[in-house]
């Protein structure tokens, strides 16, 4: 039986790795949303050969608190096939991505239990933000460069301000009158990498303004120089992320281990694989394929939805996509904050923001280069300024190693202000990119539409 084999493999792995867990804070956000599967129900099935398959299906689709959202997946596909209103396709696809993203995180954790902490960490680095990466790739294929930029920027802002702010606020309210301590080592590393990301985003922007002001000149056009600089910075960012992974998985692994869980709710049972290795790989590939389908629907329907809802594409990409697309991970971070496990919460929020900034964004630039799409790191003035202020506020908030609800409120208010900026900002009519796709962000400053 596969279930028995998985449990036996779990016991062997526990004996082989008594201290070095392959679980990261990112995986553990999915663990907080898991629920026990009903083994007794499977045993009642009269046909014995079907029991392993049904147990597998139950673990994948029903052993999560988000199982109620799975019907949105076939509904989104049906809405697209039967040519329903594109707003319905967009909304159902977003809802369907919520449980799929949580299941990808769960399946990554299952595979990591077999492969060990190093390979598991690398797998998490690749699949941890699979939804954002897949949406970015489909947007690049359709030439919607600004959708790529805004969605990735929105994921970073959402993790730094919305997720972290909500977590600190909820944790502070539950622990009213007391401060919640956390280990600063992990947050210091993450914020340093985020400041490097801000520098790499600012360099092409500053170069463009310096050339436009006549203070400096370049051998090619300003756009070509900015593109070359962006690609060079992308290599620097990826090299920094590789160094960060080596630091996290090899030399300083103890800084990133969620020690609070060892004696807490996530007991030893969570260390035993719930699925076999082959099954986990199969379901991971299948879930990724379904995410690709829904991501294509989201990218293809975002502009009609923008017109129908009266919202700019930049607002939907920066605010709505990250909130809904990462809802499972966000909920996990908040749950751990409520349990006074802020180190795991910081690992989820800061880890995801770092992963997107230092891995997904530069990878998107280089993939666009291979595809012949001219995507740079110049996210324009409002976007880059918002990123800088978000990183700066987060760094100051986390500098003393303790938290209370007021810090959460301040982070949330910063997120509201940034969201309001993109709500009122619009692109001048008729602006298009080199591929002919309408963009929501102009080359220079943004304009504000009158109500």
From Swiss-Prot:
Domain of life: Eukaryota
Subcellular location(s) per record: Vacuole membrane
Effect in UniProt of substituting residue 128 to A: Reduced transport of Ca(2+) and loss of transport of Mn(2+)
Membrane topology annotation: Multi-pass membrane protein
Molecular function per GO: calcium:proton antiporter activity
Gene3D superfamilies registered for this protein in UniProt: NCX, central ion-binding region (1.20.1420.30)
Gene Ontology cellular component annotations, sorted alphabetically: plant-type vacuole membrane
Region (Cation selection), start-end ranges: 128-163, 325-360
Sequence ranges on the Vacuolar membrane side: 80-86, 142-153, 213-228, 295-317, 374-378, 426-451
Tissue-specific expression: Ubiquitous.
Membrane-traversing stretches: 59-79, 87-107, 121-141, 154-174, 192-212, 229-249, 274-294, 318-338, 353-373, 379-399, 405-425
A GO biological process held by the record: intracellular calcium ion homeostasis
Outcome of substituting residue 326 to A: Reduced transport of Ca(2+) and loss of transport of Mn(2+)
Keywords assigned by UniProt, alphabetized: Antiport, Calcium, Calcium transport, Ion transport, Membrane, Transmembrane, Transmembrane helix, Transport, Vacuole
Chief localization: membrane
Result for mutant: residue 149 to A: Reduced transport of Ca(2+) and Mn(2+)
Family: Belongs to the Ca(2+):cation antiporter (CaCA) (TC 2.A.19) family. Cation/proton exchanger (CAX) subfamily.
Protein name: Vacuolar cation/proton exchanger 1a
Organism of provenance: Oryza sativa subsp. japonica
């Amino acid at each position: 039986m596969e279930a028995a084999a998985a449990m036996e493999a779990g016991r062997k792995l526990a004996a082989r790795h008594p201290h070095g867990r392959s679980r990261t804070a990112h995986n553990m956000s999915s663990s907080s949303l898991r629920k026990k599967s009903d083994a007794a129900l499977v045993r009642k099935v009269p046909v014995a050969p079907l029991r392993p398959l049904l147990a597998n299906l139950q673990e994948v689709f029903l052993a999560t608190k988000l199982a109620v959202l799975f019907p949105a997946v076939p509904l989104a596909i049906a809405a697209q096939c039967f040519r329903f209103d594109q707003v319905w396709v967009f909304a159902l696809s977003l809802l369907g991505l919520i449980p799929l993203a949580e299941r990808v995180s769960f399946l990554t954790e299952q595979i990591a239990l077999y492969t060990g902490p190093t390979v598991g960490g690398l797998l998490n680095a690749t699949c941890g933000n699979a939804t954002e990466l897949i949406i970015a790739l489909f947007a690049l294929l359709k030439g919607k460069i600004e959708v790529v930029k805004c969605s990735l920027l929105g994921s970073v802002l959402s993790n730094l301000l919305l997720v972290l702010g909500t977590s600190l606020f909820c944790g502070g309210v539950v622990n009213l009158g007391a401060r919640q301590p956390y280990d600063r080592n992990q947050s210091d590393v993450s914020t340093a990498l985020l400041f490097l990301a801000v520098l790499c985003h600012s360099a092409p922007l500053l170069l463009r303004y310096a050339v436009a002001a006549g203070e400096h000149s370049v051998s090619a056009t300003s756009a070509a120089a900015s593109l070359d600089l962006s690609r060079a910075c992308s290599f620097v960012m990826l090299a920094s992320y590789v160094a960060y992974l080596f630091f996290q998985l090899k030399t300083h692994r103890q800084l990133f281990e969620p020690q609070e869980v060892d004696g807490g709710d996530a007991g030893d049972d969570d260390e035993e694989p719930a699925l076999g290795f082959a099954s986990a790989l199969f379901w991971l590939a299948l879930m990724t394929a379904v995410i690709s389908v829904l991501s294509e629907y989201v990218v293809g329907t975002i502009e009609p939805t923008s017109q129908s809802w009266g919202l700019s594409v930049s607002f939907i990409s920066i605010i709505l996509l990250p909130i809904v697309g990462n809802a499972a991970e966000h909920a996990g971070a908040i749950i751990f904050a409520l349990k006074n496990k802020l180190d795991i919460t910081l690992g989820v929020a800061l880890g995801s923001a770092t992963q997107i900034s230092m891995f997904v964004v530069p990878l998107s630039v280089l993939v666009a280069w291979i595809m012949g799409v001219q995507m740079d790191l110049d996210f324009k003035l409002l976007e880059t300024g918002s990123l800088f202020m978000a990183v700066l506020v987060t760094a100051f908030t986390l500098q003393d190693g303790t938290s209370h609800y007021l810090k959460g409120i301040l982070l949330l208010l910063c997120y509201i202000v940034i969201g309001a900026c993109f709500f009122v900002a619009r692109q001048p009519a008729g602006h298009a990119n080199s591929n002919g796709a309408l963009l929501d962000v102009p080359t220079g400053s943004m304009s504000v539409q009158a109500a």
